[in-house]
Amino acid sequence: MAGAFIAAAVLATAITTPALAANNNQPDHIFFIMMENHGTNQIIGNTADAPFINQLANRYGVATNYHGVTHPSLPNYLAAISGDFQGIWDDCKAGPLVTCAPEEFVPGAGDASDPTFSAYTDPHSPQFGAVPPQLTPAQIASSSSTPHWFAGQTIVDQLEAKGLSWKAYMQSIPFAGADVEFYPTVGTTFYKLYAQKHNPFLYFSNIRGSASRMANIVPLPQLEYDLATGNAPNFVWISPDQCSDMHGVGNGNPLGYPTCSYPASGLDHGAIQLGDAFLRQTVTKIMNSSVWSENSIIVIAWDEDDYGGYPTGCCGSPTGSKGSQSAVLGGALAPAIVVRRGVPAHRQSSHPYNHYSVLGTIQHLWNLPCLANTCSLSTADLMLDLFGNGSDN
């Protein structure tokens, strides 16, 4: 299946994982797996479609008030590694000359960020009459003219400055550092298993301009090799492809995954089941590897609730207008689960969190500087209630 690891006869450049001091809060490895486009109530409690995810949620840490930073996908991914959504509301490809008009918080978006969305106009809908926030004219103009080639720092800069290793593992990317928007293609048709919008590293000029950094953006099968050989880096980013991250594609039949196709209506049970199977396989491989004998953490988060949830937000989400008032342009409630070795008790937090909260917590645990919106987080705003404080290990 698309979510499977290929048996790894993969040539790898060994990464030396720095030894971290014992008896402190610093984890040896943090794995961040980003899933797609579902609300908390579609996943947590849905044991029929997502049994493995719910096993994790019932055993480890779960955030019940976690939000996407905004809509759509790309700005959430940018926020997760840079502390800033970079002022865009689109999913366009990377490039110094690439600019795009906003796809969200404008009429025609076609989802819960759209003021003409059926949920707000249908008298039988519980959200009938609700008005979502919208972009201001100034925000539309600024976003439409912003090149998708960002010069700011990311967690990559911070990790390297600290002597910590990192890799980004991308399922279905054709080769390390590939500059393609979608993959694979057959003739002129894109099948979009790999989508560049889920690879935020390619949008930053100081990563694109570095051969060594581009070499760290690798196909997912490399992870199995790195785990088996003890070469897993300190920070591991994992982007499943669109048939494994619960996003889905327009037509999964040519790929051999009909349940990956968008449903005509209702909940996309097939996409959730594929994502649950991917996480079962991937998380199990991590937990069965030697890295799990060390002080390690797995974070599983969904980028946003793209279709069903009113666009609530928190913790530095941008604001737009709602009539004469300002209002949050959030990414709605989405699931987030934290698995930490040595923290056995189930933990549940209703504290408001988002992707900035995850990044800020990682920075805190590794004594890294803050970035952009993570600089506004107090210690009380960090996810230490779910990540644990190190004394439990």
Regions found by a protein language model. Name each.
Residues A2-A14:
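Bacterial N-terminal signal peptides
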Residues T13-A21:
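Intrinsically disordered, low-complexity Ser/Thr/Pro-rich tracts
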Residues L20-N393:
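N-terminal pro-sequences and low-complexity stem/linker regions of secreted or lumenal proteins
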